[in-house]
């Protein structure tokens, strides 16, 4: 506006400076208005801001530092599985206490210390001793149930026929329903033949014995012909609306029935375990046989409860339409 060498007023330079000043103000006002308009109701992406970049870089540095801190320990554990298992066992509180499952569920999919809980609230596996049900109920009182004890109970059932009346009453109810399809015989003959076929698969009796020994006294068992393999399969129907199988009970069930699949399922409102032969597995053939005729004679001398037989007839009517899982 003024020349440095003199105080002579230069109108041309003054007009140019005014134009520059006005253009700067207009540009600033436009940018401010544009920034205000662009932020009305619209989320501004600030991922490219310097502060965001610094925060992301800082976070990555912290993660890398933590990874480097434990990398030697984790690499050592990965190369020494036995030490890794020992470290996991020393954990007081498990990392995961429950895992949701869907039905049908094969019990062979469980791992060590997995309990099974079924109820209207859901189906899940729990870590033994840490699952909510185990925390409340505690450890079950299980008697000896190794292979020798199961075989002894199977052989001596003739002398303890009243104790296993729930198992034998199902045979009478199934014979009354006409289980022996295509066989024209009296109800007594059908019952004896069905009993012989069921006793030819000792694992079915073993599963029933283990469940009763595990505290499930009122479990009901149903016998149906297995069309996929020769023989019969058994449905163990639970009387309650919720079921909890302790991991020790599951281990005993699986150990008692080699060559069989045990699958948890639900039908209408009843939870059931389906015990059936596995086509690709061999069963134990070194089990003494028992006389079905002698046991049936004892059954004829025993007066079965009419309510128990009626309950079985109703259960057979309910499960006639049930399709067992493969």
From Swiss-Prot:
<keyword id="KW-0863">Zinc-finger</keyword>
<feature type="zinc finger region" description="CCCH-type">
    <location>
        <begin position="115"/>
        <end position="244"/>
    </location>
</feature>
<keyword id="KW-1048">Host nucleus</keyword>
<dbReference type="Pfam" id="PF02718">
    <property type="entry name" value="Herpes_UL31"/>
</dbReference>
<protein>
    <recommendedName>
        <fullName>Nuclear egress protein 1</fullName>
    </recommendedName>
</protein>
<keyword id="KW-1043">Host membrane</keyword>
<dbReference type="GO" id="GO:0046765">
    <property type="term" value="P:viral budding from nuclear membrane"/>
</dbReference>
<dbReference type="GO" id="GO:0008270">
    <property type="term" value="F:zinc ion binding"/>
</dbReference>
<comment type="function">
    <text>Plays an essential role in virion nuclear egress, the first step of virion release from infected cell. Within the host nucleus, NEC1 interacts with the newly formed capsid through the vertexes and directs it to the inner nuclear membrane by associating with NEC2. Induces the budding of the capsid at the inner nuclear membrane as well as its envelopment into the perinuclear space.</text>
</comment>
<comment type="similarity">
    <text>Belongs to the herpesviridae NEC1 protein family.</text>
</comment>
<dbReference type="GO" id="GO:0016020">
    <property type="term" value="C:membrane"/>
</dbReference>
<keyword id="KW-0862">Zinc</keyword>
<keyword id="KW-0479">Metal-binding</keyword>
<dbReference type="GO" id="GO:0044201">
    <property type="term" value="C:host cell nuclear inner membrane"/>
</dbReference>
<keyword id="KW-0597">Phosphoprotein</keyword>
<comment type="subunit">
    <text>Forms a heterohexameric complex with NEC2. Interacts with capsid vertex specific component 2/CVC2; this interaction directs the capsid to the host inner nuclear membrane to initiate budding.</text>
</comment>
<keyword id="KW-0472">Membrane</keyword>
<dbReference type="InterPro" id="IPR021152">
    <property type="entry name" value="Herpes_UL31"/>
</dbReference>
């Amino acid at each position: 506006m003024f020349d440095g060498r003199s105080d002579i007023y230069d109108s041309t330079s003054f007009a140019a400076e005014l134009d520059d000043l006005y253009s700067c103000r207009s540009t600033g006002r436009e940018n401010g208005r544009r920034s205000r308009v662009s932020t009305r109701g619209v989320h501004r992406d600030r991922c490219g801001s310097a502060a965001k970049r610094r925060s992301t870089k800082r976070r990555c540095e912290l993660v890398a530092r933590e990874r480097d801190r434990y990398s030697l320990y984790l690499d050592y554990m990965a190369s020494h599985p036995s030490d890794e298992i020992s470290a996991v066992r020393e954990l007081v509180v498990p990392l995961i206490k429950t895992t949701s499952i869907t039905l049908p569920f094969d019990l062979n999919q469980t791992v060590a210390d997995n309990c099974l809980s079924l109820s209207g609230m859901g189906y899940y596996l729990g870590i033994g001793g840490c699952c909510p049900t185990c925390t409340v109920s505690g450890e079950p009182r299980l008697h000896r149930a190794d292979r020798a004890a199961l075989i002894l109970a199977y052989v001596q059932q003739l002398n303890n026929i009243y104790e296993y009346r729930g198992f034998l009453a199902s045979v009478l109810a199934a014979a009354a329903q006409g289980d022996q399809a295509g066989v024209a015989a009296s109800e007594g003959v059908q019952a004896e033949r069905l009993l012989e076929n069921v006793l030819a698969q000792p694992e079915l009796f073993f599963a029933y014995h283990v469940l009763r020994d595990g505290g499930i006294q009122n479990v009901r068992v149903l016998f149906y012909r297995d069309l996929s393999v020769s023989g019969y399969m058994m449905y163990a129907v639970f009387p309650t609306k919720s079921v909890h199988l302790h991991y020790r009970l599951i281990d005993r069930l699986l150990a008692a029935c080699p060559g069989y699949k045990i699958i948890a399922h639900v039908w209408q409102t009843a939870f059931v375990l389906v015990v059936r032969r596995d086509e690709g597995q061999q069963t134990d053939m070194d089990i003494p046989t028992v006389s079905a005729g002698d046991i049936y004679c004892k059954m004829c001398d025993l007066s079965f409860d009419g309510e128990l037989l009626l309950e079985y007839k109703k259960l057979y009517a309910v499960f006639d339409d049930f399709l067992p899982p493969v």
